Amino acid sequence: MKTKTDCSVCAVAIVKEEDRFIEEWLVYHRLLGVSHFFLYDNDPKLPLRSLLGASASFVTVIDWPGDPTAGWPGRNLQIKTYTHALAGKAASYTWVTFLDPDEFIVLRKHDTLPDFLSSFENVGSVRLNWHVFGHNGYYEDPQGLVTAALTRRMAAPSPRTKAISRTEAVSSIDSAHYCRLKRGWRTVDANGRPYAEALYPGKTERAHINHYQCRSFLTWMGRVTRGDVSFDRSTVPADDRWRLDEHLCLRQFVETVARDKNELVDDYMLRFETPILTHLAARSDRGSPDPGRPRWEPANLSSTIHGSPTIPERRRRWLPGVAGRLSDGLIRLHGWRLRRRLQRNRAGE
């Protein structure tokens, strides 16, 4: 099957309450070779355009407020958004990836996405497994870059994936995690093998997705008030009700994030700390439409030696159980406050 010869890549994302993190996500994926970003602004309180500054040349912002299911029975906001993007200018690029702002594509053997994707001839979609990161013991969001601060994750990859798909091969989008392909196109994993959900040794050695789903304990608990782009309260499946209930959200944190998501130190992304901060500093120098935005100073850059980062001493002091022990104390305090509030509410009924 004859395919497009270039390897241009665009990324599509829904953005809500990501003012502290979106620039890092943009710069990092720009360094990987993403040509353009289509950002769907789902935050009416803080317009995304006020945050972007020098990103405007390679970012298209689409205002995207409202009910996630209005007019789309059975479809969530992500599917509606991605379908809209692919029906528009995203289709002019060879490849498209649908990501969340807490998901970072990681290439272990290639410098750029075009280099990586050039080896996938006659392939319609490449599915990359998640590596799920924990909170590293942070109660509040860490200062600086997410990719530098959060270095602890589950030891095993997640079977869940996100896809990079050829725009000409996509038939429809039925999930936020993959695309349905037209007849004749095939889906592979990062190693070029026919895609299968089962894990095997080396499945993420070439490429994967770092999923920073829990930047801190407070950010995790804030999911309840922020809402979820995948569901509303009337349609959320039973297994996902924790996303919309504070008590269940706390329990989910205790049983999954604090226990399982801080098992292994993975500091691969530290090698990008200097390039990311350098680009952020340069973008700050070119000005921003919001004078209140913080500036990134080159003086704060970390040093690197032959591509291997010099890890600050504070990171070396993390021992395997520290994140879990710190979380335990903070969670108990938060749980006590939650129980007291529930008791007061019941007493007032």
PLM regions and their residue ranges:
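Short acidic donor-binding/metal-coordinating loop in glycosyltransferase active sites
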Residues: 42, 100-104, 109
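Cell-envelope/extracellular polymer assembly enzymes that use nucleotide-activated donors
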Residues: 8-10
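Short beta-strand/loop segment that forms part of the nucleotide-sugar
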Residues: 35-43, 63-66
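Active-site-proximal specificity loops/subdomain of glycosyltransferases
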Residues: 47-98
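Active-site beta-to-alpha loop of glycosyltransferases that engages the nucleotide-sugar donor
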Residues: 13-27, 43
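Short, acidic, metal-binding catalytic loop of nucleotide-sugar glycosyltransferases
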Residues: 27-36
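Catalytic-site signature of metal-activated, phosphate-bearing donor transferases
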Residues: 75-80, 107-310
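Boundary detector for helix-to-coil junctions that initiate low-complexity/charged tails
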Residues: 300-349
